[in-house]
From Swiss-Prot:
This is Zinc metalloproteinase nas-12. Residues 73-271 form the Peptidase M12A domain. One of its GO terms (molecular function) is metalloendopeptidase activity. Its main location: secreted. The lineage of its organism: Eukaryota, Metazoa, Ecdysozoa, Nematoda, Chromadorea. SUPFAM superfamilies: Metalloproteases ('zincins'), catalytic domain (SSF55486). The gene is nas-12. Keywords: Disulfide bond, Glycoprotein, Hydrolase, Metal-binding, Metalloprotease, Protease, Repeat, Secreted, Signal, Zinc, Zymogen. Expressed in pharyngeal glands. PROSITE patterns: ASTACIN, SHKT, ZINC_PROTEASE. Metalloprotease. It comes from Caenorhabditis elegans.
Length: 384
């Protein structure tokens, strides 16, 4: 029988190489949109993942100010741009599978846990979100009135992307477009993909409120390589944003920070009604890796800490190295409300052609594979 160390991810180099692809690393909305958005929608989609109304588009095209003055909504928008009583009605397109819908609803339920905003299925409300799988991940900023499209294509169905787009829909801009951002990051324009400079424009000071510290880890901050050109010789993407603060890195932000939640609750005037996880950005002192330091560091370098496919594995084995300790605490406190991408499929079937071989090598029984066997070999492992 093939021996597979319980906490080693190096099975990627062995029998399971066929389904372990490092190229499937976690992607942000801007990356997905670069691949999926059609030319027609590119005319209306700006700043990576935001839509403009026709009126906003006209103002943008006629604007000669390098600072953005086109937005009908921002964190400092008027009450007409806000969702009444913090209630956001929504309709989920029937195009989504039951599994995708479960992830969507679960993500909304978690959003409610950290705030006093409520997402309710639409009945007769005139203003509502229509969540539909179009050609990317994008949203308007704040309420625009009537049926409001929020696109989440299949590749966008991940909790952190859903939260990011919902933050836009409620009224939040990107953190890296703050008027004061140049005091905290340097934008390397020479490394930006031609035609994508607009994604680094700053908002007008009069349009936003920013009494909080600059939040490098905000779920509304893009990673440091966003819209970066690819150096074909070295086969790497070039950095477009560099933190000015020593020791800080701009990574894929996949969860709310304490500052995100404070802003969210201040906008909704939540008081004591929401934000019970506002301290989640603090890593618990008991946070430890179970796997060896060498194994966890190797997993981190290969991108597995940020890959949703391996998320539960990393929480169990490398939570300290992967900086997933606060996420573990949230799972422990409220398992049923924590989004989980391992969802039950309607059809009982295997997703991988070699499940019979994997089953003989312990794939169906070893605890290490608890979080992936259902996705790949549900039928062979008798899980449905």
């Amino acid at each position: 029988m093939l021996y597979i160390p319980q906490f080693s991810i190096y099975f990627c180099l062995g029998y399971l190489l066929l389904f372990c692809k490092i190229s499937n690393a976690v992607k942000q909305s801007w990356e997905i949109n670069q691949e999926l958005i059609t030319e027609a929608n590119k005319e209306h989609t700006v700043f990576g993942d935001m839509l403009l109304t026709p009126a906003q588009l006209i103002r943008y095209e006629n604007s000669k100010d390098s600072d953005l003055s086109i937005r009908g909504v921002s964190i400092k928008g008027s009450s007409m741009n806000r969702w009444s009583n913090n209630i956001v009605p929504y309709v989920i397109s029937p195009q989504y599978s039951p599994a995708q819908k479960q992830i969507l609803v679960s993500s909304l339920r978690y959003f409610e846990r950290v705030s006093c905003f409520k997402f309710v299925e639409r009945t007769t409300q005139n203003d509502y979100l229509f969540i539909v799988p179009l050609d990317g991940c994008y949203s308007y900023v704040g309420k625009i009135g009537g049926r409001q499209t929020l696109s989440l294509a299949a590749d966008c169905i991940a909790d952190y992307i859903i939260w990011h787009e919902m933050m836009h829909a409620i009224g939040f801009e990107h953190e890296h477009q703050r008027p004061d951002r140049d005091s905290f990051i340097r934008v390397d324009y020479a490394n930006v993909i031609p035609g994508q400079m607009i994604n680094f424009d700053k908002l007008k000071t009069s349009h936003v409120e920013y009494p909080d510290i600059y939040d490098f880890k905000s779920i509304m901050h893009y990673d440091g390589y966003a819209f970066g050109r690819v150096d074909t010789a070295r086969r790497v993407r070039l950095a477009t944003m560099t933190p000015l603060k020593p020791g800080v890195t701009l990574e894929d932000n996949m969860k709310f920070t304490a500052t995100d939640i404070e802003k969210l609750n201040r906008l909704g005037q939540c008081g004591a009604r929401g934000g019970q996880y506002s301290n989640q950005g603090v890593v618990a002192s008991t946070c430890q890796d179970v796997a060896t330091a060498v194994s966890c560091e190797g997993n981190r370098r290969r991108g597995m800490c940020k890959n949703p496919f391996y998320k539960q594995m990393m929480i169990k084995s490398c939570q300290k190295t992967c900086r997933l300790c606060s996420y573990t605490r949230m799972i422990d406190e409220d398992d049923d409300l924590t989004p989980n991408t391992t969802v039950k499929s309607v059809k009982c079937e295997d997703k991988h052609p070699r499940c019979d071989i994997y089953s003989h090598n312990g794939f169906c029984t070893l605890p290490f594979y608890d979080d992936v066997r259902y996705q790949l070999c549900a039928k062979t492992c008798n899980l449905c």
